[in-house]
Amino acid sequence: IEGISFNAAERGQFNFFFFFGLNDATRYREVVEGIEANNFTFGSIGLSTNYLQSATNYAQGWKVGVAGTNRNYKGAARATYSSGLMENGWAFTAQLAWRYTPYIDIKGQIGEGIAYNSFGYFLTAEKQWGKDKRLSLITFGAPTRRGQSAAVTQETYDLTNQYNKTSWGHNNYNPYWGYQDGKVRNSRIVETYDPTVIASFDWQINEDNFLKAGVGYHYSMYSNSALTFYN
């Protein structure tokens, strides 16, 4: 992101849940294949991607969207605003995004037993001095809470249908959910939040030399619940 690597230290991979719902914020990027020459990385097996998030990369104006589906996401809304480069040398871009589904407590329905609630935010500010220097400050995050579904074998589908004589034997069966004290509960709740802050400085020294420096802070939070049973 802006030339700074945010691959996970444990696995070396990039976690795309940083950006849940922030489609407009991640619209502009550079992609290179393998060890192809580029200006942001040494390359690697597969693809390398650099997200460009300075405020002046975004088209000036408003963008608002609302969506509804009958699948895992029941509703979504997002709004994006970009000021463009102003006379004082500043530019700002911001996006808010929200995706939601309540608990699906109808057996046989796609996504039964799951719930989803995600709020994403993105803000970038850029200051330019002349045509050769610019400083960008960027922050984003997407706190998310979601219920999971299980990978189930065909044998499980067949058995639930045989012994319960209900619609449980369909291919949407999810054993992770049920009722507790009369309320729907999913035993496998995942909560994620990865707030990130970036400062990036670009300086076109002359026609042949360009300086890019950046520093970033990233905090990762991931939790996953489960239930156990005692006699």
Q: Model-derived features: where do they sit?
A:
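Transmembrane beta-barrel architecture of outer-membrane proteins
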Residues: 44-46, 74-76, 118-120, 192-196, ...
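Short strand-turn segments of transmembrane beta-barrel domains in outer membranes
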Residues: 28-40, 46-83, 109-110
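Short sequence motifs at beta-strands and strand-loop junctions characteristic
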Residues: 41-43, 69-73, 113-117, 180-181, ...
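Short acidic/polar hinge/loop motifs at secondary-structure boundaries
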Residues: 4-33
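Transmembrane beta-barrel wall of Gram-negative outer-membrane proteins
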Residues: 68-102, 106-149, 197-199, 203
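Acidic/polar loop-and-plug regions of large Gram-negative outer-membrane beta-barrel proteins
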Residues: 122-128, 134-198, 223-231
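Extracytoplasmic loops and strand-loop junctions of Gram-negative outer membrane beta-barrel proteins
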Residues: 11-14, 31-33, 61-65, 104-108, ...
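Short beta-strands and strand-coil junctions in structured, solvent-facing domains, enriched
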Residues: 7, 35-39, 101
